[in-house]
């Protein structure tokens, strides 16, 4: 392997940045995980594995993830078919707005869901209006499921919609000629493409739900509805039982590593390789049309009512003006607007360094090493950020932290958390540029910044801006790292919102949630502007 560095077409400018990033990842994760395993090695393992509480944690962690995933896929399938077969005004905008769930902070969504499904929410108010005694119950398993469905139904629907669009129109025309309708049509024409997409979609959503932290922490409502991830947080912050936290972190690491391996194996892709600009389908029957309309109406209410509730609550808050005199809000806003761009820039820089090395190795026909480089950047998907943060907490617990130290730790954690998504966005453009322009640049002697500015910038400009904006949005709403390291003097908007919700300061929480929603809405518009520009440039 070391002979690679003597290859005539592999210069230090190609690998220096990538080697530095990989070394940093190894040291960062190695130090954090070694502190966890060192403390976990002192435990009496047999006693713990017969512990009823631990067994309940593992069972509930997998159980809630399984239930959330099955429901997300089921409703996602229904929504995908309704979106595909029912033409309506504003469909393009609805499809874009479905992506809003990806950039909305979990705590903002939770605030909106409480306002709809809580004991004093919209649905309870409507029930009382019609003389019903129904009371909403958002805490516990029901609340966890509702929040997971909010985030994952749009994701599943978009993936299954791509599958429906990939069916050749000739197959649909042939099915119409053979009079295949109803379940026969679904079974013979649609199910084969759904089946290809089901396993990768299932593994992705299951992993997202299994590693869900903020949703379970806020809506769990008690020890009965606790997962391994939230148990780590509680063991550190509430009990200060570090050996117990280390055990939970080790188990979470092992489970996530297995899930990450499975998710990587069943990677999301259009497996039939077909893409159709000509979409044809036979018009559904009236009963099916009505069903599709009902599905769309229910989904629109489910998706937009929490967002609308946040806006109304923020604008009608009695503290809308006075809250701006609160120094805590300005401190949280200042830290959030400092952490987010630095984390996004760091994620972008590390991703570019890895991609420059990866694409050069692929060009030199070292495909396995090239893929290893990319997987190194995706490692955060296998090691949850809370496990990493807990390892750093153990490693540095004897140090007297200043706010600057905490700031740097959170920036690095958020950057590593965003890097897999940045890598996914930039991987194809960077590798395509290598394939298309490498020989041309070599023949003309164009290298370094000159190559980047004259040759690559045109195709990379839109995806780079898109990746930066997405990293910014993800870091802005990230709560995991700062949940462990935050305090009254070092806080962020999500951290402040969590404290306000915990102290039942709903009027203040409404304004904080509104600010976060506004910031994420601006970033969402920015993301889609450059995403559309990227699509046009292809």
UniProtKB/Swiss-Prot annotation:
<dbReference type="GO" id="GO:0022857">
    <property type="term" value="F:transmembrane transporter activity"/>
</dbReference>
<keyword id="KW-0677">Repeat</keyword>
<feature type="transmembrane region" description="Helical">
    <location>
        <begin position="19"/>
        <end position="39"/>
    </location>
</feature>
<feature type="transmembrane region" description="Helical">
    <location>
        <begin position="293"/>
        <end position="313"/>
    </location>
</feature>
<feature type="transmembrane region" description="Helical">
    <location>
        <begin position="466"/>
        <end position="486"/>
    </location>
</feature>
<keyword id="KW-0812">Transmembrane</keyword>
<dbReference type="Pfam" id="PF00528">
    <property type="entry name" value="BPD_transp_1"/>
</dbReference>
<protein>
    <recommendedName>
        <fullName>Thiamine transport system permease protein ThiP</fullName>
    </recommendedName>
</protein>
<feature type="transmembrane region" description="Helical">
    <location>
        <begin position="242"/>
        <end position="262"/>
    </location>
</feature>
<feature type="transmembrane region" description="Helical">
    <location>
        <begin position="376"/>
        <end position="396"/>
    </location>
</feature>
<comment type="subunit">
    <text>The complex is composed of two ATP-binding proteins (ThiQ), two transmembrane proteins (ThiP) and a solute-binding protein (ThiB).</text>
</comment>
<dbReference type="InterPro" id="IPR000515">
    <property type="entry name" value="MetI-like"/>
</dbReference>
<dbReference type="GO" id="GO:0015888">
    <property type="term" value="P:thiamine transport"/>
</dbReference>
<feature type="transmembrane region" description="Helical">
    <location>
        <begin position="337"/>
        <end position="357"/>
    </location>
</feature>
<feature type="transmembrane region" description="Helical">
    <location>
        <begin position="509"/>
        <end position="529"/>
    </location>
</feature>
<keyword id="KW-0813">Transport</keyword>
<feature type="transmembrane region" description="Helical">
    <location>
        <begin position="202"/>
        <end position="222"/>
    </location>
</feature>
<comment type="similarity">
    <text>Belongs to the binding-protein-dependent transport system permease family. CysTW subfamily.</text>
</comment>
<keyword id="KW-0997">Cell inner membrane</keyword>
<dbReference type="InterPro" id="IPR005947">
    <property type="entry name" value="ThiP_ABC_transpt"/>
</dbReference>
<feature type="domain" description="ABC transmembrane type-1 2">
    <location>
        <begin position="333"/>
        <end position="528"/>
    </location>
</feature>
<dbReference type="GO" id="GO:0005886">
    <property type="term" value="C:plasma membrane"/>
</dbReference>
<comment type="function">
    <text>Part of the ABC transporter complex ThiBPQ involved in thiamine import. Probably responsible for the translocation of the substrate across the membrane.</text>
</comment>
<feature type="transmembrane region" description="Helical">
    <location>
        <begin position="57"/>
        <end position="77"/>
    </location>
</feature>
<dbReference type="InterPro" id="IPR035906">
    <property type="entry name" value="MetI-like_sf"/>
</dbReference>
<feature type="transmembrane region" description="Helical">
    <location>
        <begin position="141"/>
        <end position="161"/>
    </location>
</feature>
<keyword id="KW-1133">Transmembrane helix</keyword>
<feature type="transmembrane region" description="Helical">
    <location>
        <begin position="406"/>
        <end position="426"/>
    </location>
</feature>
<keyword id="KW-0472">Membrane</keyword>
<feature type="transmembrane region" description="Helical">
    <location>
        <begin position="97"/>
        <end position="117"/>
    </location>
</feature>
<keyword id="KW-1003">Cell membrane</keyword>
<feature type="domain" description="ABC transmembrane type-1 1">
    <location>
        <begin position="58"/>
        <end position="263"/>
    </location>
</feature>
